[in-house]
Amino acid sequence: MKSLNRQTVSRFKKLSVPAAIMMILSTIISGIGTFLHYKEELMPSACANGWIQYDKHCYLDTNIKMSTDNTVYQCRKLRARLPRPDTRHLRVLFSIFYKDYWVSLKKTNNKWLDINNDKDIDISKLTNFKQLNSTTDAEACYIYKSGKLVKTVCKSTQSVLCVKRFYK
């Protein structure tokens, strides 16, 4: 095998530095492109597309208006539920979506229920207990409107917001 003279070796050295730089840049750009292409698989979001993430919960404005029965069904289809009346997130949700929306509080036969699961609710633990306790109707459903729970007819149509915890 022939040995290379000094000039040839010098030329190889001069050419190898730019080639090495190009290879490094190419590798970095390729890595960035791969990351961007597979970012959903590499770094999954806690909430699906369209859902808004806030304090370990995901919220979805369905942009539809329904009665309470249909609302519960719609949220269940999405593996979610209606916002509870005792959550501290109600004001934040109102400021984000700026809509009146159903909450999971219903009065039926003078019993207070969570319509997500039909379990009894102790309304004395709710912040607006006095306002709710003054309700004389045998049946009423509630929406969150401008900072407070407001009684409405259960068959009326109101905006639907669904909520679920991360990764469910």
Swiss-Prot record:
Membrane topology note: Single-pass type II membrane protein
Disulfide bonds: 75-162, 141-154
Originating organism: Variola virus (isolate Human/India/Ind3/1967)
Top-rank taxon: Viruses
Subcellular location: Virion membrane; Host Golgi apparatus
Annotated ranges, domain C-type lectin: 54-163
Record protein name field: Protein OPG162
Glycosylation site positions: 133
Pfam families: Lectin_C
Topological domain ranges for the Virion surface compartment: 38-168
Keyword list, A-Z: Disulfide bond, Glycoprotein, Host Golgi apparatus, Membrane, Signal-anchor, Transmembrane, Transmembrane helix, Virion
Described purpose of this protein according to its UniProt entry: Forms a complex with OPG162 and OPG190 to coordinate the incorporation of OPG164 into wrapped enveloped virion (EV) membranes and, subsequently, the production of actin tails. Therefore plays an essential role in efficient cell-to-cell spread of viral particles.
Keyword presence, Cell cycle: no
Subunit composition and interactions: Interacts with protein OPG161. Interacts with protein OPG164. Interacts with protein OPG190.
Family, as annotated: Belongs to the orthopoxvirus OPG162 protein family.
One CC-aspect GO term: membrane
Positions of transmembrane segments: 15-37
Intravirion-side segments: 1-14
